[in-house]
UniProtKB/Swiss-Prot annotation:
The protein's name: Sec-independent protein translocase protein TatA
Keyword annotations: Cell inner membrane, Cell membrane, Membrane, Protein transport, Translocation, Transmembrane, Transmembrane helix, Transport
Subunit structure comment from the entry: Forms a complex with TatC.
Summary of the function given for this chain in its UniProt record: Part of the twin-arginine translocation (Tat) system that transports large folded proteins containing a characteristic twin-arginine motif in their signal peptide across membranes. TatA could form the protein-conducting channel of the Tat system.
Highest taxon of source: Bacteria
């Protein structure tokens, strides 16, 4: 078991110290608060990643739409040029 670079012996020592410092009555409350904090951090991280992905997708699509618009304009100019020759 290796969570955040902390192995099982280290986790055991941390839990024993927490038990000694906070006592058995406050540990469930602290665990609950820690869980809520980790959940909100994960949610914020996911939202941030989604925003980055959205911006990257917009940047990827922008050159395609510009190229498409330019191609359409060139084709329209060719058609107009051919029509004016007739």
């Amino acid at each position: 078991m290796n969570i955040f670079g902390v192995g099982l012996p280290e986790v055991t020592v941390i839990l024993i110290l927490a038990l000694l410092i906070f006592g058995p009555k406050k540990l469930p409350e602290l665990g609950k608060q820690l869980g809520k904090t980790l959940k909100s951090l994960k949610k914020a991280s996911n939202e941030f990643q989604n925003e980055i992905d959205q911006v990257m997708n917009e940047e990827d699509e922008s050159p395609k739409s510009i190229e498409s618009n330019q191609t359409n304009e060139i084709n329209q100019e060719k058609i107009d040029s051919e029509n004016s020759k007739k």
